[in-house]
Amino acid sequence: MRHKIFALVIVTALFFGVVAVSSAQNANLTIGLSVPSLEETGFFATLTAEAQNAADAADAQLTILSADDDPAIEADNLAQLIADGVDALLIYPLDAATVIAGVQAANEANIPVLLLGEDVERTESEIEVASLVAADPAAIGELAASYFCENVSEGSTVVALAGISGLEADTELAEDDYRVVALQAELEGLSAVLASDCATITLTAQETATFTNEDSTAFLSNALGSNVGGVFAPNGELALSTIRAARAARLLSSIKILAAEVTPETLGAIESNRLAGIVSATPESLGQIGVETVLAVLGGEEVESTVSVELALVTSESVLEFRGQDDDSGDN
């Protein structure tokens, strides 16, 4: 079955072969890895385990610190890693403002920084980031479209929601804002594959009213209709709002809803059969390729400003494996 066990799609295969610098050199290198949490989803536990494996294979040292979902702890962790004199920082952002301040401090200390999973605003803050290791947003839209082509009836409509997590409706972003660019790429990837592979399915883009309160559910209720077969939500908040709106309209069982963000809530929605799936970077590839990329930087190699990683379509069939849990029936 195409989508079983993550339905892995390799977006960009990045292999540096043997690590960029020799094992003898790597033994003297220490990489600091900051993650938002090691709880709830299993996502970051898997990411850090693969990062540790990649560091061990290269004889490099890896220091892993969790922010426990607290920006204050994230700030302390970044300050501690910089004070400890790590050779490079890998950061999966929890709080953008905290990360920007941490990157600025690392830049001043001449410590190269790579971001994992998510970007932060760089233009106004003038921070320097060696590379962003993350999912290709266009490929996220393409994989979502492939799912809709296989699971939504011909003649149906797919609604693509355009919204950025944490922003209110009156917030204006520049066209070149990294969040706007990424969202546009997702929608373009979605549109291109639907048009080429299942032209009988109509794509409708919807601008959402707000993204953080109950008004979004009311807005979405007006966007959903009897002919809607699928909804693409670019973040967890919109996915959960869509679920509430579909349930209120008594359409939840007939609409396939996909999210493009892993959160404890979206994973729980898959497990309770309220959410069809999540399109996400695999934590394994983020951890492995993140370490490989930072070692290449430390070895003096030129790396791309953005390095794409593997994608997964997480469904009810693969959610336990994605969490790093056994799915054998009867096991606890």
Question: Which residue stretches match the model-derived regions?
Answer:
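Hydrophobic alpha-helical
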Residues: 91-108, 190, 205-268
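Extracytoplasmic "Venus flytrap"
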Residues: 30-54, 58, 63-76, 86, ...
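Short, solvent-exposed amphipathic alpha-helices that sit
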Residues: 42-58, 140-144, 169-201, 215, ...
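Hydrophobic alpha-helical segments within soluble ligand-binding/sensing domains
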Residues: 74, 132-159, 215-217, 262-266, ...
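Short, well-structured alpha-helical segments in soluble
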Residues: 72-86, 214-227
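Short, low-complexity disordered leader/linker segments with a strong preference
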Residues: 1-30, 104-111, 153, 327-332
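Flexible loop/hinge segments that line or gate small-molecule binding clefts
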Residues: 96-139, 147-150, 157, 161-172, ...
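Hinge/cleft segment of the Venus flytrap/periplasmic-binding protein
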Residues: 27-29, 169-171, 175, 194, ...
